[in-house]
């Protein structure tokens, strides 16, 4: 399993926790997911890093509003799509 596959799996697992209402557990996992994503995206092109910053801002806004379903959607769809778009 590559680092990319691992972080994508963690994104989906964390999103699932938010959907189940396990927001405390999910929030702890989210920190690790964001750290892993950040590491993978450090060497990405500038436009990808800009999209990452926008997605991260949106996810943190969702967390602040306690909109767990929207946060789960951003993690499972927007973030995963971004990670999959990064050239290996």
Predicted segments — roles?
Residues 1-88:
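C-terminal-biased regions
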């Amino acid at each position: 399993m590559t680092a990319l596959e691992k972080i994508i799996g963690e994104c989906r697992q964390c999103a699932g926790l938010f959907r189940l209402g396990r927001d405390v557990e999910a929030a702890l996992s989210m920190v690790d997911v964001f750290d892993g994503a950040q590491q993978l995206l450090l060497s990405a092109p500038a436009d990808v890093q800009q999209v990452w910053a926008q997605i991260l801002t949106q996810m943190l806004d969702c967390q602040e509003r306690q909109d767990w379903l929207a946060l789960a959607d951003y993690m499972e769809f927007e973030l995963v799509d971004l990670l999959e778009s990064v050239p290996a």
